[in-house]
């Protein structure tokens, strides 16, 4: 994906050295946008191998409203382990905000159910949004949301999605985020009777950690390959009805995995 390669090149050439919460240090740029036409293939990075199982199960976990890592562990996914407490809890992170945003009167809002229904009833609405950034809950979260706001847009029978990501770990996190939100767009399009349009990824602080620079340079020596195709079980019509077995990725022929340590 040349869009991702361009981002790596921009950070390596123009990035500012910054200190960060983890103490690792970063090269950072502010404000970057990538666009992916979902009709042109599924935007799964090919310049290194990504684990589809982890991407799919994490998204299904978010959609369940779950905030404990047991489901992930049950399916062999460990990407959230560094932030969980001794009981596996993460506090009111993504799933809680997506599915049960707390209201002042003690109730809750299911943002996912609401946005799917709104797309069906009023596809021209400019309010087709979901946010995970809840200032009242941020201090209770093991990790405040990095990908914090997304908006759907319907035109000419196609559903597009734009994600705003306040903090973007470009080497490790961003490839996951691209695939995850592209998949979410395909899923929402299917259950609302629309075709997939674009995934637009807007980044705030887009950074490479100082211990990922050599890996990024290695990745830039690799030519992107043809994108794979994601097929979804057409029988699923409920956004909460998807299972891992409903997704099939074909034609994924990436370069080998590149190891890098996560900054916690």
UniProtKB/Swiss-Prot annotation:
Major place of residence: cytoplasm
Residues reported in the UniProt entry to bind dUMP: 21, 126-127, 166-169, 177, 207-209
UniProt keyword annotation of Transport present: no
Coiled coil: none
Keywords: Cytoplasm, Methyltransferase, Nucleotide biosynthesis, Transferase
GO biological process: dTMP biosynthetic process; dTTP biosynthetic process; methylation
Binding site for (6R)-5,10-methylene-5,6,7,8-tetrahydrofolate: 169, 263
Catalytic residues, chain numbering: 146
Top-level EC class: transferase
Keyword Cytoplasm appears in the UniProt entry: yes
Pathway entry: Pyrimidine metabolism; dTTP biosynthesis
GO cellular component, one term: cytosol
Listed Pfam families: Thymidylat_synt (PF00303)
Reaction(s) catalysed (UniProt annotation): dUMP + (6R)-5,10-methylene-5,6,7,8-tetrahydrofolate = 7,8-dihydrofolate + dTMP
GO molecular function, one term: thymidylate synthase activity
Subcellular location: Cytoplasm
Enzyme nomenclature, EC number: 2.1.1.45
Subunit and interaction comment: Homodimer.
Function of the protein: Catalyzes the reductive methylation of 2'-deoxyuridine-5'-monophosphate (dUMP) to 2'-deoxythymidine-5'-monophosphate (dTMP) while utilizing 5,10-methylenetetrahydrofolate (mTHF) as the methyl donor and reductant in the reaction, yielding dihydrofolate (DHF) as a by-product. This enzymatic reaction provides an intracellular de novo source of dTMP, an essential precursor for DNA biosynthesis.
Sequence similarity: Belongs to the thymidylate synthase family. Bacterial-type ThyA subfamily.
Protein name: Thymidylate synthase
Protein encoded by which gene: thyA
